[in-house]
């Protein structure tokens, strides 16, 4: 073996060692640890406070997403009744969209800017950051709402903080709304459900079309949207039955009228 080949072999070994160290330092030792998600948060109330991490995103006094939407499909989280108090729940809170619309009290005690007083937030979006068993990525407005009066901006500068949360019954103060999504057509129904008091989240949607005596289950599409694909035209008026996570069933007779149109909201009476 020549001197040149020996030197080249040494260079190759050094490169391999450098790559291995870079992987260990950059991939395994840097950044926050990956924490597995906690157990799913179900429709139980009056429970003790649970620990979580809180972060925030979007504009400091905004609603979170720039388009006022999010992973639940809502398009108005900056308006009442959400009032920019939206939260991205991690896996056991968002639950692949089945947690959309559920309500939580949140509070923080540290840092000093925290008021310790609970405020209500709504699950409107998702996050998959593995920084804690439970993680709320809050709209800037919602994060600041945990602060003492006048200390909102200082609290937001803290970035990641410890917080406590518990599930509460929703009191939207608005009528249940059924929004037919833009892509709907006579053979395809995509229904966004929002403002459901009580549990807030929906686990089943069944519809009864004009002339039918039986309910047909819709398929969960994504977020708070449920759908039906049909070989025949879907005829109104349509009665909708909602089932919440706690098992409450509510029927909305003929809430979607004959001649229904895409990109239109229909409100329960």
UniProtKB/Swiss-Prot annotation:
Tissue expression summary: Expressed in pollen.
Domain (Expansin-like EG45) ranges: 69-175
Signal peptide limits: 1-30
Disulfide bonds: 72-100, 103-170, 108-114
UniProtKB keywords: Allergen, Cell wall, Cell wall biogenesis/degradation, Disulfide bond, Glycoprotein, Membrane, Secreted, Signal
SMART domains documented for this protein: DPBB_1
Biological process terms in GO annotation: plant-type cell wall loosening; sexual reproduction
Residues glycosylated per entry: 40
Localisation: Secreted, Cell wall; Membrane
Chief localisation class: secreted
Cellular component, GO, one term: membrane
Alphabetized InterPro entries for the sequence: Expan_Lol_pI, Expansin/allergen_DPBB_dom, Expansin_CBD, Expansin_CBD_sf, LolPI, RlpA-like_DPBB, RlpA-like_sf
Occurrences of domain Expansin-like CBD (ranges): 187-268
Membrane topology: Peripheral membrane protein
Family membership: Belongs to the expansin family. Expansin B subfamily.
PANTHER family: EXPANSIN-B1, EXPANSIN-B3
Function: May aid fertilization by loosening the cell wall of the stigma and style, thereby facilitating penetration of the pollen tube. Acts selectively on grass cell walls, which are relatively poor in pectins and xyloglucans and rich in glucuronoarabinoxylans and (1-3),(1-4)-beta-D-glucans, when compared with cell walls of other angiosperms, including other monocots.
This protein's name: Expansin-B11
Organism placement in taxonomy: Eukaryota, Viridiplantae, Streptophyta, Embryophyta, Tracheophyta
Primary gene name: EXPB11
